[in-house]
Amino acid sequence: LSSFFAWLEDEDYIVKSPVRRIHKVKTGKTVKETYSDEALELMRDHCDNTRDLAMIDLLTSTGIRVGELVKLNRSDLDFENRECIVFGKGNKQRKVYFDARTKIHLQRYLSERTDGNESLFVSLLKPYERLQISGVEIRLRKIGRELNFNKVHPHKFRRTLATMAIDKGMP
């Protein structure tokens, strides 16, 4: 409303905006939920296949976006340096690093795969197509429902990593 009156004033439709005297009320920002260490462990323990375990570990240890996760190819991984090349928003390329546990689970997942698809994460059934964002979301929601967690979604892993980094003193 104040923007509209400011525009009226700028365009000389009114002399003075009546809302200028009204102070804006600051609304408190809601603190978004993150996963606890216990919740992350329960999700890992609840995975019934190596793909989901590797996926949860990669999301947890790197904080990458779900869109970046599904774009990953096998060739983007460097196990020796525990890093992967991610194509982010605007097709910008950057390196992210994953932990030793993620390395082990990714290697186990890749060693079990029998397909020749270059995609890092593929469907569990033939024809083993690249996993889509919706596939990741559905899978995580299913794990969450089975554990009676409310609202398990990929972005929460990113927020959890950022919150943990801030708690440990990262500026």
Regions found by a protein language model. Give the residues of each.
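Conserved catalytic core of the tyrosine transesterase superfamily
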Residues: L1-P171
